[in-house]
Amino acid sequence: MWGYIHLISWVAIVVLTVTALLIYSKSVKSFTMLQMINRVFYILVILSGIMMVKYSIEQSWILAIFKILMGIIVIGVVEMLLSYRKQQKPTGMFLMIFVIVVVITISLGFYLSGGYPLFN
C-alpha cells in the first residue's frame, strides 16, 4: 500500500510542478495554489518513504541512503524551480537538474523495490 501512495504522490508532484510552470504566465493565483498542493504531496512522499525505508535497506543500504538523499534533492529542486519561476528568474538550469534527478530517483526506487508496485 505504501508503494502505491509513494508512486502516486511522486507522479502528482511531477504533474503539478510541470502544470505550475506552464500556468504561471496566465494566473499567479493558480500557480500559488498548485505550489501549496505540491507541498501536501511532499508530506505524503516523506511519510510513505519512511514507511518503506526498511525494505530498501534490506536490498542495499548504500543505495537506500543515496535514494533518500536524491528524494530530498528532488523536493529542493522543485521548490527552487517554482520560487525562481515566481520571481521571474531563468529556470532552465533547475529544469534540467529536475529532469536528471527525477530520472535517477525513479530508477533507484524501482531497483530497490524490485519494480513494485508497477512491475509485480
UniProtKB/Swiss-Prot annotation:
It is a multi-pass membrane protein. The keyword Transmembrane applies. The chain crosses the membrane at residues 3-23, 33-53, 62-82, 92-112. Signal peptide: none annotated. Keywords: Cell membrane, Membrane, Transmembrane, Transmembrane helix. Disulfide bonds: none annotated. It is found in: Cell membrane. InterPro entries: UPF0344 (IPR010899). The keyword Nuclease does not apply. One of its GO terms (cellular component) is plasma membrane. Belongs to the UPF0344 family. This is UPF0344 protein LMHCC_0278. It comes from Listeria monocytogenes serotype 4a (strain HCC23).
